[in-house]
């Protein structure tokens, strides 16, 4: 039946004035340099090469172009089901995943802690096996990276990290797609991180050098990134000929930066530390004073939700802010992740420059 549906849709034409627009979602021509990601887990970007990450971004651009700009219908995930496990609340991760998976013809199933609590009423091993028998993939937004690792070990289907205490890889894919669209290429850009040494920063550290991007990090004392992740990032920088610097001075990190990036100072689960953290992060607000020492073509990113103490309105709502396209690209990148892990689809759009 699916083959018959594809045949009908491939041959169908929608009248557009005197022309016909063909809705075509075939897999396209085989690519000699095609990256094979089908069946993989996406737990952290440290497990992926630069070419593999670029492939996911290429696929993101392809889906965005074909669906948003050309108006094509691509039921690439028809007959597929996605389990969505959320221990932490979410707006963008949930909305982008649910709408994106459904737009591609799949069925997302959302589960909160009221429905499932990893490792509490049932062992993670048993949960992984049940999910594997009923869904084609799982996206999990959890407190502990170790839960994700065990889930992936015991499951026979792809597990995707929707956020953990250590990493947030799907956010970084959206960031990189946004920067590629704006600058035309990622190689040679300097990223300036000003804020907490958190999961977003960790994911940047595991991937930026693979694109030839430099990274300048400023965090308050006591809020530096995980030492083991810093060590790996230093090795990536050495292998790729890029620069990595860590400081406690926000202006030093912003100096010459093409992209100013910050995030929440108080992540979910850290509410009791609010007073202490607000005091520690004094002087870390991104303002036009910060931007003054950045590169002339500076832009700004924030994964949201945003608080005024992290970045002032002048920067956040300025024409230099890429926050809105960054948020939208969460949808196209998670769609690309699911398509790459669950299908043999090949992008038809010409490969962007990275």
UniProtKB/Swiss-Prot annotation:
GO biological process: arginine biosynthetic process via ornithine; citrulline biosynthetic process; L-arginine biosynthetic process; urea cycle
Family: Belongs to the aspartate/ornithine carbamoyltransferase superfamily. OTCase family.
One Gene Ontology CC term in the entry: mitochondrial inner membrane
Keywords: Acetylation, Amino-acid biosynthesis, Arginine biosynthesis, Mitochondrion, Phosphoprotein, Transferase, Transit peptide, Urea cycle
Transit peptide region: 1-32
Organism: Bos taurus
Disulfide bond residue pairs: none
Regulation: Negatively regulated by lysine acetylation.
Catalytic activity from the UniProt record: carbamoyl phosphate + L-ornithine = L-citrulline + phosphate + H(+)
Chain positions with N6-succinyllysine modification: 70, 80, 88, 144, 221, 231, 238, 274, 289, 292, 307
Domain of life: Eukaryota
Gene name of the encoded protein: OTC
Family annotation (Pfam families): OTCace (PF00185), OTCace_N (PF02729)
This protein's pathway: Nitrogen metabolism; urea cycle; L-citrulline from L-ornithine and carbamoyl phosphate: step 1/1
Quaternary assembly: Homotrimer.
Task of the protein: Catalyzes the second step of the urea cycle, the condensation of carbamoyl phosphate with L-ornithine to form L-citrulline. The urea cycle ensures the detoxification of ammonia by converting it to urea for excretion.
Keyword Acetylation: yes
Modified residues (Phosphoserine): 133
Protein name as catalogued: Ornithine transcarbamylase, mitochondrial
Location in or out of the cell: Mitochondrion matrix
Active-site residues, Swiss-Prot/TrEMBL: 263, 303
Predominant location category: mitochondrion
Protein EC: 2.1.3.3
N-terminal signal peptide: none
């Amino acid at each position: 039946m699916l083959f018959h549906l594809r045949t009908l849709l491939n041959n169908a034409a929608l009248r557009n004035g005197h022309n016909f627009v063909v809705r075509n979602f075939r897999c396209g021509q085989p690519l000699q340099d095609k990256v094979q990601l089908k069946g993989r887990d996406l737990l952290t970007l440290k497990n992926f090469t630069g070419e593999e990450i670029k492939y996911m971004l290429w696929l993101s651009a392809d889906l965005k172009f074909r669906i948003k700009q050309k108006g094509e219908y691509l039921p690439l995930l028809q007959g597929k089901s996605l389990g969505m496990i959320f221990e932490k609340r979410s707006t963008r991760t949930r909305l982008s995943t649910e709408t994106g998976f459904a737009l591609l013809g799949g069925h997302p199933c959302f589960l909160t802690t009221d429905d499932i609590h990893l490792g509490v009423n049932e062992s993670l091993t048993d949960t992984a096996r049940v999910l594997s028998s009923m869904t084609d993939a799982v996206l999990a937004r959890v407190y502990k990276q170790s839960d994700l690792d065990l889930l992936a070990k015991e499951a026979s289907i792809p597990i995707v990290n929707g956020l953990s205490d250590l990493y947030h890889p799907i956010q970084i894919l959206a960031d990189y797609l946004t920067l590629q669209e704006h600058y035309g290429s990622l190689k040679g850009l300097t990223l300036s991180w000003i804020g907490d040494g958190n999961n977003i920063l960790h994911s940047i550290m595991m991937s930026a050098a693979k694109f030839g991007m430099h990274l300048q990090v400023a965090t308050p004392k006591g809020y530096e990134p995980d030492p083991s992740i810093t060590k790996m990032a230093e090795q990536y920088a050495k292998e790729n000929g890029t620069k990595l610097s860590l400081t406690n001075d926000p202006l030093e990190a912003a100096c010459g930066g093409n992209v100013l990036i910050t995030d929440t100072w108080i992540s979910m689960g850290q509410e009791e530390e609010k007073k202490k953290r607000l005091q520690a992060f004094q002087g870390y607000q991104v303002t036009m004073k910060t931007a003054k020492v950045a590169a002339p073509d500076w832009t700004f990113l924030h994964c949201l939700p945003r608080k005024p103490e992290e970045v002032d309105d002048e920067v956040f709502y300025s024409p230099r802010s890429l926050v809105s396209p960054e948020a939208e690209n969460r949808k196209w990148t998670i769609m690309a992740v699911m398509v790459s892990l669950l299908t043999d689809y090949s992008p038809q759009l010409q490969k962007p420059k990275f």
